[in-house]
Swiss-Prot record:
Residues that span the membrane, as ranges: 38-58
Cellular location(s): Cell membrane
Polar residues bias locations: 241-268
Name recorded for this polypeptide: Lymphocyte transmembrane adapter 1
Chain's role: Negatively regulates TCR (T-cell antigen receptor)-mediated signaling in T-cells and BCR (B-cell antigen receptor)-mediated signaling in B-cells.
Segments on the Extracellular side according to the record's topology features: 1-37
Length: 387
């Protein structure tokens, strides 16, 4: 029994040994496969890391190259073809020949002397500010004298429109030429260097006396306002028997200093004239005589039909003007006639006649054509009061 048991065990052991060897070999193969797979994984990971590192290095190198200066530096090897810079002289006069000093001549300074003398002569010969107005005044005086020699009345006139009776432009013997003082520093018209024609008291009396009898050559220009006791006398043109000029105030205020624009004391172009006392009956007569409305323009001469219509209107208004100026106590409030004057653009002629109906109109037409050259000066007519 023992022999069979031992034999059985021996056979079993022999059978089991190859299986054990096979199992060992299989386990060894599996371990080798596992280790090889791990090694290959590590190798692949290392390769990826190396590739990433190389890419990063290349990117950094390219970025550094872009930051570098694009031009080449010449400091390393300078070019030999460049010319050397010339040495400039510190003083240009050192290079000039000194012939004048060798011959005993001194350098000329005539330019500096001439310039200094010119400056001194300008300062010494320049006129002071006080002499400049005197020269201008002398020139103006010569101009005024030449103008008076031509026979025209020259003066400074008020800017406001006023009724005027204009005839001959010859200067009146009764006018007094008043010239302001030259030394006054004021710039007003009272102290200016212009001549002002002021009518005397004798001429005013003749004007008031001749108001009842109208002169032979009378042409009335309209004014802007009625005559008031505070009115001023403006410059007349012509002789006292032929021409009379009466001024109306620019403003209603009688105080010359209160007016900012029309006052002659505050402006450089106007002159305060003597006041006309219209408290007398003769003054009131003039007040009614020269009351006109300002409907004045330069109207081109129309056809013959318009002239005939104007002559008819003038002849119809002549009786009113004569009736108003016959006696010194006659005072008829004038009124501006309308209706037929609309065709003439509200412009008609008002003129008193002492001889005939057509004669004065012809004289007035000649006077207006001489004054305006191309246009007829037509003023508003004065008609009697209507009931």
């Amino acid at each position: 029994m023992d022999v069979t048991t031992s034999a059985w065990s021996e056979t079993t052991r022999r059978i089991s040994e190859p299986s054990t060897l096979q199992g060992t070999l299989g386990s060894l193969d599996k371990a080798e496969d596992h280790s090889s797979s791990i090694f290959s994984g590590f190798a692949a990971l290392l390769a990826i890391l190396l590739v990433v590192a190389v890419i990063c290095v290349l990117w950094c190198c390219g970025k550094r190259k872009k930051r570098q200066v694009p031009y080449l530096r010449v400091t390393i090897m300078p070019l030999l073809t460049l010319p050397r810079p010339r040495q400039r002289a510190k003083n240009i006069y050192d290079l000039l020949p000194r012939r004048q000093e060798e011959l005993g001549r001194h350098p000329s300074r005539s330019i500096r002397i001439v310039s200094t003398e010119s400056l001194l002569s300008r300062n010494s010969d320049s006129p002071s500010s006080e002499h400049v107005p005197s020269r201008a005044g002398d020139a103006l005086h010569m101009h005024r004298a030449h103008t008076h020699a031509m026979g025209y009345a020259v003066g400074i006139y008020d800017n406001a429109m006023r009724p005027q009776m204009c005839g001959n432009l010859a200067p009146s013997p009764h006018y007094v030429n008043v010239r302001a003082s030259r030394g006054s520093p004021s710039t007003s018209s009272e102290d200016s260097r212009d001549y002002v024609n002021i009518p005397t008291a004798k001429e005013i009396a003749e004007t008031l006396a001749s108001a009842s009898n109208p002169p032979r050559n009378l042409f009335i220009l309209p004014g802007t306002k009625e005559l008031a006791p505070s009115e001023e006398i403006d410059e007349g043109c012509g002789n006292a028997s032929d021409c009379t000029s009466l001024g109306s105030p620019g403003t209603e205020n009688s105080d010359p200093l209160s007016d900012g624009e029309g006052s002659s004391q505050t402006s450089n172009d106007y002159v305060n004239m003597a006041e006309l006392d219209l408290g007398t009956p003769q003054g009131k007569q003039l007040q009614g005589m020269f009351q006109c409305r300002r409907d004045y323009e330069n109207v081109p001469p129309g056809p013959s039909s318009n002239k005939q219509q104007e002559e008819e209107v003038t002849s119809s208004n002549t009786d009113h003007v004569e009736g108003r100026t016959d006696g010194p106590e006659t005072h008829t409030p004038p009124a501006v006639q309308s209706g037929s004057f609309l065709a003439l653009k509200d412009h008609v002629a008002c003129q008193s006649s002492a001889h005939s109906e057509t004669g004065p109109w012809e004289d007035a037409e000649e006077t207006s054509s001489e004054d305006s050259h191309d246009y007829e000066n037509v003023c508003a007519a004065e008609a009697g009061a209507r009931g």
